[in-house]
């Protein structure tokens, strides 16, 4: 679902892979991608709920230099108009080495809804981080 929405908005997906819910694996991959500047934006999906195995926000916050609290706040606020269970989402967002990292929900419909709502502002943020604006 991420690929479809991102490409429909005119952007390129350079890496997509299902990863295990393992904090060390997730943080290592995100860190390598950001430090290698493989992409301007890293989007994750899933692993931000309340299940014991959910660790994506912790993996993200462990590696970012600066947190961007407004993105997950806006995502939760928007999704609350559709389901109150959105308040249970623990997504995080931040910046590492001029690369933005954003955690998205795990369900395809929620990913689509969030990206369509947030992507213009996320792209603006990426441009600011890159010094393009």
Give residue ranges: language-model regions.
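Non-catalytic beta/alpha edge segments that cap or flank active sites
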Residues: 1-133
């Amino acid at each position: 679902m991420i690929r479809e929405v991102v490409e429909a908005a005119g952007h390129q997906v350079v890496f997509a892979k299902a990863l295990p819910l393992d904090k060390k694996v997730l943080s290592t991959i995100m860190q390598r991608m950001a430090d290698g500047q493989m992409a301007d934006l890293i989007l994750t999906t899933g692993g931000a709920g309340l299940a014991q195995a959910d660790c994506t926000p912790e993996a993200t916050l462990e590696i970012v230099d600066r947190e961007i609290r407004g993105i997950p706040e806006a995502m939760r606020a928007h999704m609350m108009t559709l389901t109150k269970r959105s308040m249970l989402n623990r997504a995080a967002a931040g910046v590492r080495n001029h690369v933005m990292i954003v955690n998205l929900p795990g369900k395809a419909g929620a990913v689509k809804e969030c990206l369509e709502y947030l992507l213009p502002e996320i792209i603006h943020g990426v441009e600011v981080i890159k010094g393009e604006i």
